């Protein structure tokens, strides 16, 4: 769910006004971003531009309006994967969801009318996020997972305040898919569970996976068969006096990443089935690990009862509670003029961006967050929950747990990114990355 880079190997445009420092400022609940770099990314780093788009955490940013408003839900079916025209690189995307439904980092491909997420040798994989947020709805995808120890495929919903609903496929176990959920990133390893898949081959066979997210319940289904149901009422926490239930607008994300990378936490590697084999059958031919996505559908539900509706275009947070009641639907614009712009001033750099000037308005370390396709809630993490409420209640569905996928990973335009893993842990009530060394190469 979240990653905060401990160091970044920068490969930026020749910028005249960008700081030479290799590390962006860090952010947490107790240390918000400075006004100069007001947006807190999923990785707990501060910046402008893409830092302020999808994944920007308003609770750790300079102010709630540092992050851009997020495009409202759009019901749609995606089934023509004959090209990648509907995907924008995260080093190019500035928030116009009307031009690109998806933003990506890594190595997406198309083959036989399907979308492939690929992971070449020693790379950090691929992550694709839908640019239209969902505030309750149903998502369904036809998937053939990746395979192999240490290789993980994700199909999830993730909000900017780190509510999360997951499907995770561990390549060492092709007979099951893992389900999980989180509220504001609070770690509770009792929230996970395994769902068996008929035929016992998530890699070789197509299966249809559905998340049906309603204000009062979440249902996970495989091939139309309900595998798990979570009732909101079962998530009430007596300590915090609140429901630890995913309830804020979320992005659909698809990912493939190396959970079994040698640099990861031992518990993470064990959960992933062992260290990844970079000389495996798939690495030899076709030359990469891969997960295959076919038709993907999004059905948007009506806003919850009592929702604060002031428009029809975008979601914003109006208070720092990060709850369903904190969300407002507005007509605010969602598009930045440049990578130097933020939610505080979305028109910064309009003229220089148009002229192609290489300065803070170009993509760089402090304007495009970097990470990889996996993050968060990893086994072996000893850190505790975020809201000071202790461990949230469990629905008793099992104790299995896995990673959740984040967003905003940087795309490499040549070769492979450095093999590192950004893992989410909690720092007070927010996240800090354990490992993040990614070579950022802008397109």
Swiss-Prot record:
Disulfide bonds join 56-67. Residues 350-420 are annotated as: Disordered. The active site is at 164 (nucleophile), 168 (proton donor). Chitin binds at residues 168, 257, 268. One of its GO terms (cellular component) is side of membrane. Keywords: Cell membrane, Cell wall, Cell wall biogenesis/degradation, Disulfide bond, Glycoprotein, Glycosidase, Glycosyltransferase, GPI-anchor, Hydrolase, Lipoprotein, Membrane, Secreted, Signal, Transferase. GO terms for biological process: carbohydrate metabolic process; chitin metabolic process; fungal-type cell wall organization. The GPI-like anchor contains a phosphoceramide lipid group. The anchor position has not been determined. It is found in: Cell membrane; Secreted, Cell wall. InterPro entries: ConA-like_dom_sf, GH16, Glyco_hydro_16_CRH1_prd, Glycosyl_Hydrlase_16. A lipid is attached at residue 416 (GPI-like-anchor amidated asparagine). Residues 417-443 form a propeptide. GO terms for molecular function: glycosyltransferase activity; hydrolase activity, hydrolyzing O-glycosyl compounds. Residues 411-420 have a biased composition (Polar residues). Its EC number is 3.2.1.14, 2.4.-.-. PANTHER family: GLYCOSIDASE CRH2-RELATED, GLYCOSYL HYDROLASE-RELATED. This is Crh-like protein 2.
């Amino acid at each position: 769910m979240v990653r905060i880079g401990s160091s970044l190997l920068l490969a930026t445009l020749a910028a005249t006004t960008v700081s030479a420092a290799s590390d962006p400022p860090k952010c947490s609940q107790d240390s918000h971003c400075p006004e100069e770099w007001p947006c807190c990314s999923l990785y707990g780093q501060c910046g402008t531009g893409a830092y302020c788009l999808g994944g920007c955490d308003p609770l750790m940013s300079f102010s709630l309006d540092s992050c851009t408003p997020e495009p409202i839900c759009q019901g749609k079916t995606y089934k023509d994967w004959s090209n990648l025209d509907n995907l924008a690189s995260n080093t190019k995307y500035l928030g116009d969801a009307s031009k690109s439904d998806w933003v990506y980092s890594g190595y997406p491909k198309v083959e036989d009318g399907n979308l492939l997420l690929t992971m070449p040798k020693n790379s950090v994989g691929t992550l694709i996020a839908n640019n239209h947020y969902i505030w309750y709805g149903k998502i369904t995808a036809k998937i053939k997972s990746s395979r192999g120890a240490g290789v993980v495929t994700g199909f999830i919903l993730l909000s900017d305040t780190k509510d999360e609903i997951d499907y995770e496929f561990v390549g060492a176990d092709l007979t099951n898919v893992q389900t999980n959920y989180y509220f504001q990133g609070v770690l509770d390893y009792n929230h996970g569970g395994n769902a068996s898949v008929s035929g016992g081959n998530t890699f070789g066979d197509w299966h249809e996976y559905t998340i049906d997210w309603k204000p009062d319940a979440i249902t996970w289904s495989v091939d139309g068969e309900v595998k798990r149901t979570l009732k909101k009422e079962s998530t009430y926490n007596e300590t915090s006096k609140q429901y630890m239930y995913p309830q804020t607008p979320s992005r659909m994300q698809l990912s493939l990443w190396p959970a079994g990378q040698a640099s990861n936490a031992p518990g993470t590697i064990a959960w992933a089935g062992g260290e990844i084999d970079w000389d495996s059958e798939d690495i030899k031919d076709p030359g990469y690990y891969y997960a295959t996505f076919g038709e993907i559908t999004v059905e948007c539900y009506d806003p919850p009862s009592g929702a604060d509706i002031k428009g029809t275009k975008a979601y914003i947070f109006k208070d720092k509670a990060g709850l369903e009641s904190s969300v407002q639907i507005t007509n605010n614009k969602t598009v930045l003029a440049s990578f130097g712009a933020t939610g505080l001033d979305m028109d910064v750099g309009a003229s220089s961006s148009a002229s192609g000037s290489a300065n803070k308005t170009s993509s760089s370390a402090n304007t495009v967050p970097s990470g990889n396709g996996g993050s968060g809630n990893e086994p072996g993490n000893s850190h505790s929950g975020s809201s000071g409420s202790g461990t949230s209640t469990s629905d008793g569905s099992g104790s299995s747990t896995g990673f959740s996928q984040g967003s905003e990973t940087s795309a490499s335009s040549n070769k492979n990114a450095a093999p590192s893993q950004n893992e989410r842990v909690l720092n007070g009530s927010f996240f800090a990355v354990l490992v993040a060394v990614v070579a950022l190469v802008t397109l």
